[in-house]
Amino acid sequence: MSKFIKVSILFCVVSVILGAFGAHLLKDLLSETELSSFKTGIRYQMFHGLAILILSLNSNKFTSKLKTSLLLMSIGTVLFSFSIYFLSIDDLLSFSMKFLGPLTPIGGTILITSWIYLLLNVKNNDTTHI
């Protein structure tokens, strides 16, 4: 679980850095829609970073399949949030990042899958953990 704790902390740190970057450097460079999309990526990255941290620290409440859910959540977060970041700043770059467009819904689908998989793998035999 320590690997996922490190991943979660990295997700949170990067989301704070990108939040500051967006608030101070990108606010005058991006359209309102692009900035809103950028913030969506940050929000999802932070929420899932915190979720991975909480789940990793409470791994005893889940079946041994928790690692699969955490891996899916990590992959989904990278695909979803980072594709949004690059698509949001596409007009600022000298090359197009529009090819990343399909990764956003794929990442979102993986995130949804990770939560459903997690739900299905909560220990049912111990009600003190629910």
Briefly describe each language-model feature range:
Residues 1-130:
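Polytopic transmembrane helical bundles with strong interfacial aromatic enrichment
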